[in-house]
Amino acid sequence: MTAIQLIVGLGNPGAEYEQTRHNAGAFFVERIAAAQRVNLVPERKFFGLTGRFTHQGQDVRLLIPTTYMNRSGQAVAALAGFYRIPIESILVAHDELDLPPGVAKLKVGGGHGGHNGLRDIIAQLGNQNTFHRLRLGIGHPGDASKVSGFVLGRAPRAEQEKLDASIDFALGVLPDIFAGEWNRAMKNLHSQKA
């Protein structure tokens, strides 16, 4: 299995979106950066905040696009192209309506499931979807017409605590992910629920 060289955390830029459900992926990358003592700095040519650390001699780059969600692919394609990172070496962390808060799941490939950030990444990578995903459950409002307001809203405290716990679970399986032990990472992560 190809080693992960790029971890992307999806979200929207700006203070008004900072603590919204849609920024769950960005929360995950911020937590990795803090744990690795990496400063995320703006890089205009990559349309995002970037950082780098080394894990067992392998560079791992972090990216939080500063484009709006529906233009996330611009940042991912720019950074992956510049550093020649294979699509299979990318892990994208994002909010997931189809999972309840407190649940996180890993997935390889697949469609966008209506997620505009994933849709744009797939398009910008030449309609290739073989990157890895970390799906962070945020729950569903129950009615499709309420999705936009829901993802752009802040979670109540109890819900946010569950999301934070699922991010902790995901951070706990990063060593397996870096080792290419995807089955073990999935088994361990998928058995956790806040």
Curated annotation (Swiss-Prot):
<comment type="subunit">
    <text>Monomer.</text>
</comment>
<dbReference type="GO" id="GO:0006515">
    <property type="term" value="P:protein quality control for misfolded or incompletely synthesized proteins"/>
</dbReference>
<protein>
    <recommendedName>
        <fullName>Peptidyl-tRNA hydrolase</fullName>
        <ecNumber>3.1.1.29</ecNumber>
    </recommendedName>
</protein>
<comment type="function">
    <text>Catalyzes the release of premature peptidyl moieties from peptidyl-tRNA molecules trapped in stalled 50S ribosomal subunits, and thus maintains levels of free tRNAs and 50S ribosomes.</text>
</comment>
<feature type="binding site">
    <location>
        <position position="17"/>
    </location>
    <ligand>
        <name>tRNA</name>
    </ligand>
</feature>
<feature type="binding site">
    <location>
        <position position="70"/>
    </location>
    <ligand>
        <name>tRNA</name>
    </ligand>
</feature>
<feature type="site" description="Discriminates between blocked and unblocked aminoacyl-tRNA">
    <location>
        <position position="12"/>
    </location>
</feature>
<dbReference type="GO" id="GO:0000049">
    <property type="term" value="F:tRNA binding"/>
</dbReference>
<feature type="binding site">
    <location>
        <position position="68"/>
    </location>
    <ligand>
        <name>tRNA</name>
    </ligand>
</feature>
<dbReference type="GO" id="GO:0005737">
    <property type="term" value="C:cytoplasm"/>
</dbReference>
<dbReference type="InterPro" id="IPR036416">
    <property type="entry name" value="Pept_tRNA_hydro_sf"/>
</dbReference>
<keyword id="KW-0963">Cytoplasm</keyword>
<comment type="similarity">
    <text>Belongs to the PTH family.</text>
</comment>
<feature type="active site" description="Proton acceptor">
    <location>
        <position position="22"/>
    </location>
</feature>
<keyword id="KW-0378">Hydrolase</keyword>
<dbReference type="InterPro" id="IPR001328">
    <property type="entry name" value="Pept_tRNA_hydro"/>
</dbReference>
<dbReference type="GO" id="GO:0004045">
    <property type="term" value="F:peptidyl-tRNA hydrolase activity"/>
</dbReference>
<keyword id="KW-0694">RNA-binding</keyword>
<dbReference type="InterPro" id="IPR018171">
    <property type="entry name" value="Pept_tRNA_hydro_CS"/>
</dbReference>
<feature type="site" description="Stabilizes the basic form of H active site to accept a proton">
    <location>
        <position position="95"/>
    </location>
</feature>
<comment type="function">
    <text>Hydrolyzes ribosome-free peptidyl-tRNAs (with 1 or more amino acids incorporated), which drop off the ribosome during protein synthesis, or as a result of ribosome stalling.</text>
</comment>
<keyword id="KW-0820">tRNA-binding</keyword>
<dbReference type="GO" id="GO:0072344">
    <property type="term" value="P:rescue of stalled ribosome"/>
</dbReference>
<feature type="binding site">
    <location>
        <position position="116"/>
    </location>
    <ligand>
        <name>tRNA</name>
    </ligand>
</feature>
<dbReference type="Pfam" id="PF01195">
    <property type="entry name" value="Pept_tRNA_hydro"/>
</dbReference>
